[in-house]
């Protein structure tokens, strides 16, 4: 879980656009965030297993 201060700092618009970075909308994790969904791989996996992400299913080959 990310510190609350970092999450609040991330929500504010940065002075320069290059300073912007992605964070998970659920847990605040800064790494391995899927841009399409806006959540990290860990939260994505949990939601996918629950069936809460439409059109997403486990790969099998």
Curated annotation (Swiss-Prot):
Protein role: Binds 16S rRNA, required for the assembly of 30S particles and may also be responsible for determining the conformation of the 16S rRNA at the A site.
Similarity field: Belongs to the universal ribosomal protein uS14 family. Zinc-binding uS14 subfamily.
The protein's name in its UniProt record: Small ribosomal subunit protein uS14
Cofactor dependence: Zn(2+)
GO cellular component, one term: cytoplasm
GO MF term (any one): rRNA binding
Quaternary structure annotation from Swiss-Prot or TrEMBL: Part of the 30S ribosomal subunit. Contacts proteins S3 and S10.
Matches recorded under Pfam families: Ribosomal_S14
Keywords: Metal-binding, Ribonucleoprotein, Ribosomal protein, RNA-binding, rRNA-binding, Zinc
Residues that, per the record, bind Zn(2+): 24, 27, 40, 43
Cofactor binding note from Swiss-Prot or TrEMBL: Binds 1 zinc ion per subunit.
């Amino acid at each position: 879980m990310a510190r609350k201060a970092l999450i609040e700092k991330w929500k504010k618009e940065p002075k320069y656009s290059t300073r912007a970075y992605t964070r998970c909308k659920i847990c605040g994790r800064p790494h391995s965030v899927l841009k399409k969904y806006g959540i990290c791989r860990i939260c994505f996996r949990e939601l996918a297993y629950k069936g809460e992400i439409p059109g997403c299913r486990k790969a099998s080959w």
